[in-house]
Design a protein with these regions (language model features):
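Transmembrane alpha-helices of multi-pass small-molecule transport proteins
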Residues: 33-84, 111-112, 163-170, 184-203
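Membrane-interface helix caps and helix-loop-helix hairpins in membrane proteins
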Residues: 91-96, 143-152, 173, 205-210
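Hydrophobic transmembrane alpha-helices of multi-pass small-molecule transport proteins
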Residues: 52, 115, 124-144, 161, ...
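Specific alpha-helical transmembrane segments that line the substrate/conduction pathway
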Residues: 39-50, 86-121, 160
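Glycine-/small-residue-enriched transmembrane alpha-helix faces in small-molecule transporters
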Residues: 1-43, 146-173, 193-197, 216-218
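Specific transmembrane alpha-helical segments of multi-pass solute transporters/efflux pumps
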Residues: 19, 24, 53, 57-99, ...
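Cytoplasmic-side transmembrane-helix entry/capping segments in multi-pass membrane proteins
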Residues: 10-14, 68-77, 124-136, 153-158, ...
Length: 218
């Protein structure tokens, strides 16, 4: 059973990484079609929230809504944590290549381990430390190549990684109190709400633009 769980865990991490690496490609197409970061993320998270609500509603098994306090915590995880990480990341890929952005972004496990060690006293194993050092060397080499990265882009990606770290550490505790579908539904709803509020409240000097052509929506 343990081996099956580990295999499933590796598979899910791989699929998550694959999906995250593909997102910038679609975003670039939207940018080329006239959209900006917030316009892309409004569409992305609104669709995600609706889909997760439908999946939760029609998936097998009885699912109960969590207590109001937990609902609020999950909503804030999306409205502050996940939306913040996405905003920094998708803004970064407007300033440098998507490939470099992805590589640098994956330094976030280093932040997770270090902050988890400092805050939750979770001491990493030797294998983990070795893997993280290797990852940091790879990121440094990639970011240091001439013309590959910009200072602004690197800072934005690192901010995204750091924000996602706090989201991961906070979410690991909140998600234990509810089922996965319910938790993700509230997180996506929180993220979508944050960007809709930005659109409604943003000054005219920072307009939100959506794709102007069909290719940007596909």
């Amino acid at each position: 059973m343990l081996k099956n769980q580990r295999a499933l865990g590796f598979a899910l991490v791989f699929l998550s990484s694959l999906g995250f690496s593909m997102a910038p490609t679609f975003s670039k197409r939207a940018y080329e079609s006239g959209a900006n970061t917030v316009g892309v993320l409004i569409v992305r998270f609104t669709i995600a929230a609706v889909l997760m609500l439908l999946i939760r509603q029609f998936s097998s098994g009885q699912r109960v809504w969590p207590k109001p306090r937990l609902m609020f915590d999950l909503f804030l995880l999306g409205a502050i944590g996940y939306s913040g990480a996405a905003f920094f990341y998708f803004t970064a890929i407007e300033n440098m290549s998507t490939g470099v952005s992805i590589v640098i972004w994956y330094i976030y496990p280093v932040f997770v381990v270090l902050i988890g060690w400092a805050v939750f006293k979770t001491k990493p194993k030797r294998q983990t430390i070795f893997s993280l050092i290797s990852a940091m060397i790879g990121v440094a080499i990639t970011a240091g190549q001439p013309g590959n990265a910009t200072t602004k882009g690197v800072i934005l990606v690192l901010l995204s990684s750091l924000t996602y770290t706090f989201y991961t550490l906070s979410g690991s505790r909140a998600f234990k109190k509810t089922d996965l579908y319910t938790g993700v539904t509230f997180v996506m709803t929180g993220a979508a709400t944050a960007f809709w509020l930005y659109w409604l409240l943003a000054p005219s000097s920072t307009p939100v633009t959506f794709p102007q052509h069909t290719s940007g929506w596909v």
